[in-house]
């Protein structure tokens, strides 16, 4: 029993043990089953993932096939483009060859033309020789006829006087005488035979002469025919040469045009090829990335296979002792570490899925095809274009998501613009339409893993080749706006001079690379060594893969930068931009902008809690809209611009130490580059300080960081006074460099954009100045431009963009069009905008910028106006509407806060409807120089009239020339210690309806001038110096004879005498009040300035010589006179009237003005009337100054229209003065008269004033210039010559008679179809002239008549007849005819007939003179008065003068002992005319000479400065040469005495200026 119990007890214990083991086994089996279920579920999920991966691989393969197909298409299009390029090159070579052939043909034709011209010259020479031979033959024929007549008369006389004498001697018985009839018959037979023989002889001679004459006529006709044929051939050859020249010009223009066209097409195709190559390279890189990712996926799959094998081994190794230990670890370790490996692989798969988003983008290829197809379809593709084609910006890119269709890609934007969309908010990115002259900055954003999967991997390649093309078409422009949306910054790189500094911590990099991975030290450690080693291998592979990716990207960057450097070396470097990378905190948004010039002192401020960037920016760009809306910064942007940084920083050679200039005004020159490194927490920050070349763009979208950013200490740049001027000047100078060939129009706009924010701390503002330089064409389709070709000036319009679209409190800067169309190429406009200084004091919505305008023009006029909007009536607004995508701007009449009333502000509001509204406040301030009184004219007119003129003069004084200052100083001096005093009395002020203001003032000026201050030798500098010296000598002589008291100054209180010179000859300096020219403001009004003055001064005799270069005035202090001047300025012309009256001891002065509307008579005074009219279409200056000595009776009669009746008065001087105003005519008349005691004078003048008297000298010069008439001039110089009669006529319309006086008158009148009229002298002549050219002569003993007849019409026919008669007692006067003359004994007659027709240029002249005399007179030529010159004393010399190409031949005799010169001025034609007149007190003595015709050519000179004005139609001027080449030859055919010689003088066509101060007196 006991054994059984023991046995059963042991069994029971065993059963209990077995039950416990069974329970444990069942629990273990259940647990393993649960684990198996989990493993099966995991395997099923892995299999489903592999299935999805296989599907993705199929999609990848499909898209790769499509990409290959597109690549093939691109290769085919590239081959086609190359074929077209080769065809164009061949065509260009063909055109060049044709151009060479055309040049060869032209040279051959030029040679032929030269040969024909030489033949023509030879034919002309032969014709001249034949004509000379003909003349000689005719002369010989006349001589033979005369000899024949003499012989006939001799024979007749001999026959008549024939007598016979007979003598007979009767030595023998006388023979029977012959019969008388036989003797008579024999003699008759003898005489008849001799008569027949002589008649036969003479008939033979006459027949021979007739035959010779016939042959001469035939030869002459033949020569004329040959000359005519040669002329026709020459004309045909000339026309042919002209046609060939035109053809050559057309061919050259066509060649240039086709060359430009083909060059543009080649550039466009090369651009397309470059873009396609860039896309190909981008595809290659993308495919390499895909392969690399595929390799990584294979590695991950291998790792998963190893894990599956590990689990399988765990299942099979249940009996292994390590199971217990592994189980305990499983039970103790929490669930979270086990999911770490799952999350790791999940993140890896997520990264792969994100990269799988790439093949979904196919729109860039359509855009590329569109761009390549639209290159030839753009309407302005041959014009000046501006397109920025981004080259390699798509190498890494073509960046978009599956929602890239939401990014607008229109035909007016750049076809290859990169738009980045975020899958988190699906907001498209607006492209940047800025004019980026350099390449876009490369931006890389390392991917992240956030809760929202599928964020695009945005790798934007740097655009290395920035192809800039000129485009007038406003579309097809856009730029790469590469932004990235990311939540955490990854690693950061700062690039300096091609080096990359990469500071990062491993754990930080891991954390940045995947935002969800957390690798903790308590990671799951596998029990098995295999599992642990596998896990470590996976981690190492991941880490090494990250480093390998970074190294690959870095190597790609280096390759790209090397390629960019090569591209920069190949083309001219126009990039002045330095893109600088930004460091922005995690919650902020990064904006990358490319600028041209920056202001100094930009620094990145680093903080441990975050990174912010502050900027002081100066942008030099065109129409750059802010890209703030396109860059939503949830990531860190990495900007790399090594090549441009290297290119610009190579120029920096100065020393460090320029950081302290941060508070100075922005400089436009790069001075120094500094580099600093700041160690941070887990990273190293490198700072580059490039003064004036760096720009940091501040992101203000993050409101949380903006408060801190604006409240911390920011240095504020202040611009005031000279610093602003210096900065603007440097900007303008820098902008104008390299643009000498263009219109230099520079618009500089300075916009201060306040980053105002109501924060808790101190608020400072960074002030970026935006200066925009106007280029020739617009760079963007939305910043629109109008270019007007008519004036050569580019008018720029600046569009505007809201700075932020999502932040209602952000600063909204805008640029309005404030450019006004100017009228000069050299205009420079400055646009200055300054904001409110304290914008934090009012609402944020009312913040904005104020736009000022500074116009600096060539006339030193500054218009300075503050504007925030465009006034409707002043500025033009150019808006494209919805086509350019610009929002309409509406003007809201809402007043805004302005500082001091001088600054307005413009405000833009973003309303709910999306419309951009503007709140304008316009305050203008204009400062005009040199008319500053325009700004305060109200204050001037509000004062008393007595002080108005002085205030106006004070305002004008700084900008006037020195000479005007000196003259105006006499009106403004009021001190008593000076030698003169002035009193200004403004009588009345009148305002006319046309906007002109007449200010009538009386200025009483008395001043004593020392003789040492104004020396008489100053007049020698004038062009009429010799005349003035002669005039002054006469004045000195006349003053020396007069016992006048020492002049006194009437206003001197003490009455002391004025210091006198030797002969009391004093100069009184006249003060002329210069009125400013008519000034036009914007409304077109003319600034009024008008004055009258009456001057009292010790003046009685005044010498005023007006020359083309200036005024020289000298006054003789003798008496008190009065000067009245009236100056009135109207809107369209300036009229200046001067009435200067100088009184002297004269008996009576009577003056009648030209229009007979005014007659003034006074005792002891003479008048001087000056009319000066200055207008846009006419400039008339009429000056007449008359000075008198002791004149008993004086009378003036003027006539401007038609001559009045003849006035004959003994003891009276009659002269006329008048003006001839025209529509466009310049009239200058000057008369200077010096007279001593005058007994009596008489003269009648025409349109110009003349005067003569005994014992006085008068010089009168009248100049008249018209637009088509050239110069018209009249010069009279009268010397004291008794017993002479001077007469002259003008236009053959009036009669001039004067007795007992002598006058030498030279008048030069140049009109389009009327040559010069000359006047001569004849004593004791009574002449009546009418328009019919009828001449009546009443002669008595000793009468000489000279007649000049000029007829002018279209054919320019001139007839001139000179008739000189010397009637002796007992001889009746002969009637004068045109064809024949009957000359009685002791009567000499000279006829000159000059006729110039359309085909005959050389007139024929005949002189027949009666008896030899020793003194001669001058016969004026038909074109100009000849210069008479010679060297023999007492001998009469016939002078032969040839007048250039169109010769006027005449022969005259003159006595070289009595020669006077009269100077005349033809300033506009560039030469001077001098005429010589010969006069003698006794009378005229005409030399006897034969008719002489010498055809002379060549170049010669006359001794002296005699100039001739022969030309045709009053334009051609021929001058004498300065050197003397006088050839004397004895005329063999002269009948005169041996003293008679022939002087040949040649006139060439040189127009030379006569040396100043050399007169023939």
From Swiss-Prot:
Specify where the region named Tail lies, as residue ranges.
301-1561
Domain IF rod intervals: 11-322
* Renumbered residue ranges of the record's region Linker 12: 164-186
Q: GO CC annotation: what is one? A: adherens junction
- Which InterPro entries does the annotation name? IF_conserved, IF_rod_dom, SYNM
Predominant location of this chain? cytoplasm
UniProtKB keywords: Cell junction, Coiled coil, Cytoplasm, Cytoskeleton, Intermediate filament, Methylation, Phosphoprotein
- Subunit structure and binding partners: Interacts with DES, DMD, DTNA, TLN1, UTRN and VCL. Isoform 1 and isoform 2 interact with GFAP and VIM.
Q: In which tissues is it expressed?
A: Isoform 2 and isoform 3 are detected in adult skeletal muscle, heart and bladder, whereas isoform 1 is only detected in adult bladder (at protein level).
* Induction section of the entry: Up-regulated in reactive astrocytes following neurotrauma (at protein level).
Region ranges (Interaction with TLN1 and VCL): 1152-1453
| Species whose genome carries this gene | Mus musculus (Mouse)
Q: What is this protein called?
A: Synemin
Region (Coil 1B) residue spans: 59-163
Where is region (Head) located?
1-10
Annotated Basic and acidic residues bias: 601-624, 1222-1231
What is the gene name?
A: Synm
Report the locations given in the UniProt record.
Cytoplasm, Cytoskeleton; Cell junction, Adherens junction
**Which lineage is the organism of this entry classified under, starting from the top rank?**
Eukaryota, Metazoa, Chordata, Craniata, Vertebrata
* Coil 2: annotated segments: 187-300
Family membership, please give it.
Belongs to the intermediate filament family.
